[in-house]
Amino acid sequence: SGQKVCYGDLKHSCYKIAYFQDLSRRVGFQEARQACEIDGGALLSLESEAEQQLIENMLQNLTKSGSGISDGDFWIGLWRSGEDLATTACPDLYKWADGSISPFRNWYTDEPSCGSEACVVMYHQPTANPGLGGPYLYQWNDDRCNMKH
């Protein structure tokens, strides 16, 4: 299930957002990746500021439309191997699950924190109090891959 939006003029012509209010239906990174592949797609690779803005606008419109989307982060296709790796090189080790080589990143302040957090979510917490980097909306955060989003 999920909201699907298609565009005729973009490299990635269709986007599908799957959001579950029921916490028991949320999944970890690998489960989300497999669900996308079974559905004929892939976890999102954000390759430019323009594409990031497109996704932000999509989420804003879905939130306004009464679709039930509220607080809940979204897995994107950025990850790194070596979950216990905490070196200064860590931010450069993230790669896109679909093989995209885009260097575009939209990390939240002080992210990625690395260590055991090797998979990446896009923040979507409109009701959360802002942190040092502002509202937790649309920036990226590394998280443990088994967390349910």
Task: Please name every model-derived segment.
Residues 1-149:
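Extracellular, disulfide-bonded carbohydrate-recognition/adhesion ectodomains
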